[in-house]
A protein has these predicted regions:
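N-terminal non-catalytic structural scaffold regions of very large proteins
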Residues: 1-218
Length: 218
């Protein structure tokens, strides 16, 4: 007998499988990929959130069918999600590959030429950087409120004295576009959050950026 939460993840995996099914039209597969991620976000927000609350309460709550504790369920969910993330990444690459012949391509910064990199740096400086606000977490500056489903760049910074700080930069903004055209390549785009992450060191010139990543809160 399968745990209810793990059973739901299996259901959502079937949605993901449709996104990777070559027999399904490409537009529908993109829709299935979007539905899969939206479902997973809601699952973590509601059901995993409830399990985490139960763990915080210190009360041992067991699931009726399998007798699993909240902690056991969360561990099992995380493991299952890691496996699904690998599958999702492979399907994403497959979908992106099929979009290229149709004139649509998402590109990473490291795939750009030096000239293209300079063009995007100018775009970042003029069109994006003025609208970004960095939050450095410290005892004097408490952890900021993170909005549900918004994208954030996070960084681990090191001061000249060797101390570490954490920084959070909201990347979701109605002022600048999320899809940035690469002017030298027709139909080629970059996500604004990828550009922000690449040029993150420009925002922290008095620090060394030791690590950086993108996160999204659910």
């Amino acid at each position: 007998m399968m745990n209810r939460e793990l059973s739901w993840l299996k259901f959502n995996e079937r949605v993901l499988n449709e996104a990777g099914n070559p027999a399904v039209p490409l537009a529908e597969r993109l829709t299935f990929a979007s539905i899969y991620q939206s479902n997973l976000d809601e699952f973590y927000r509601v059901r995993v959130g409830t399990l985490m609350d139960q763990m915080e309460s210190k009360e041992v709550v067991r699931e009726n069918k399998t007798n699993m504790t909240s902690e056991q369920q969360v561990k099992a969910i995380l493991q299952e999600t890691r496996d699904l993330d690998q599958k999702k990444a492979a399907i994403y690459e497959q979908l992106m590959g099929e979009l290229e012949p149709k004139g649509i391509r998402l590109i990473n910064f490291n795939k750009l030429s030096a000239e293209e990199g300079k063009l995007l740096e100018t775009y970042f400086d003029n069109e994006i950087a003025p609208y970004l606000s960095a939050n450095i977490v410290s005892k004097q500056q408490p952890f900021p409120f993170l909005k549900n489903k918004d994208i954030y760049a996070v960084a681990l910074l090191e001061t000249k004295g060797g101390k570490t700080r954490a920084a959070i930069i909201p990347c979701s903004n109605n002022v600048f576009r999320r899809l940035i055209d690469i002017p030298t390549r027709k139909g080629t785009f970059m996500l604004s959050e990828e550009l922000i992450l690449h040029f993150l060191p420009k925002m922290f010139k008095n620090y060394v950026v030791k690590e950086k990543s993108l996160i999204r809160v659910t």
